[in-house]
């Protein structure tokens, strides 16, 4: 009798083990392709960015009211848990995110199924794309012009368009500021790339299309690793000294807040 009980117990354990293994295999089986949505949530420090209605004070005791925050993101690459990288189609990989228009979402289509652990993207337009000439820009040239992200074709794209007003201890009257950063043709290359760990795996399959929520901290543009005082210079555009510092600060303003995994119907 004891032998029968022992056999039944072993059979039960094996059945549970096989069942669990089967469930695990099903849970990790990702096939097909789907979209990955990137939500850029603009902030100032720990506060939400509210254009024209809220004021923010930086570490240099300058109080800013921000009226525009537009930036170009491009050249997306996703790396999976096996160390394999999927590079998004280059011609389709240029986007303007604009707090002004409310267009802060980037949708990457036709991403192969997988478990993705990090994302890489550019801030701005790379020289390879720019040197294709105006005829090689496709629809993105029109998008950039319509969102105030161009100087002229010869001068190039504005990678960042950051505007508003400010006051400080030395500038007591409300004063306009403008920070426009770009590569200025091919003579000064301010294009930067950012790589971020997702923290939580982004799962892509024919039934799963994750949303990655990123935070862009506008405070870092002037108050990041490189401190830039509006009281000293309230307009920064074609500056061989300060524009590269703005580019470095801007590239550092992005973090991943969280990843939402789910089916398209559940979003």
Report the location of each language-model feature.
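Bacterial N-terminal signal peptides that target proteins for export
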Residues: 1-9
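A short, solvent-exposed, low-complexity linear motif enriched for acidic/polar residues
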Residues: 21-267
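C-terminal motif of bacterial Sec signal peptides marking the signal peptidase cleavage site
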Residues: 16-19
């Amino acid at each position: 009798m004891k032998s029968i009980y022992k056999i039944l117990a072993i059979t039960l354990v094996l059945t549970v083990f096989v069942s669990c293994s089967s469930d695990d295999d099903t849970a990790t089986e990702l096939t097909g392709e789907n979209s990955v949505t990137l939500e850029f949530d603009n902030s100032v420090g720990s506060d939400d960015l509210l254009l024209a209605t809220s004021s923010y004070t930086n570490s240099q005791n300058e109080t800013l009211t921000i009226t525009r925050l537009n930036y170009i993101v491009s050249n997306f690459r996703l790396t999976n848990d096996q160390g394999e990288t999927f590079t998004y189609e280059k011609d389709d990989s240029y986007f303007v995110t604009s707090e002004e228009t409310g267009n802060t979402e980037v949708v990457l289509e036709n991403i192969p199924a997988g478990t993705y652990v990090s994302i890489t993207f550019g801030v701005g337009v790379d020289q390879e794309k720019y040197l294709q000439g105006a005829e090689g820009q496709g629809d993105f040239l029109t998008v950039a012009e319509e969102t105030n992200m161009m100087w002229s074709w010869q001068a190039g794209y504005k990678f960042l368009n950051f505007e508003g007003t400010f006051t400080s201890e030395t500038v007591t009257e409300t004063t306009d500021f403008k920070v426009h950063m770009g590569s200025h043709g091919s003579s000064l290359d301010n294009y930067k790339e950012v790589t971020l760990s997702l923290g939580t795996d982004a799962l892509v399959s024919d039934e799963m299309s994750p949303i990655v929520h990123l935070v862009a901290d506008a405070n870092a543009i002037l108050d990041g690793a490189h401190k830039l005082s509006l009281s000293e210079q309230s307009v920064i555009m074609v500056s061989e000294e300060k524009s590269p510092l703005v580019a470095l600060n801007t590239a550092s303003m992005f973090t991943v807040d969280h990843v939402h995994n789910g089916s398209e119907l559940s979003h």
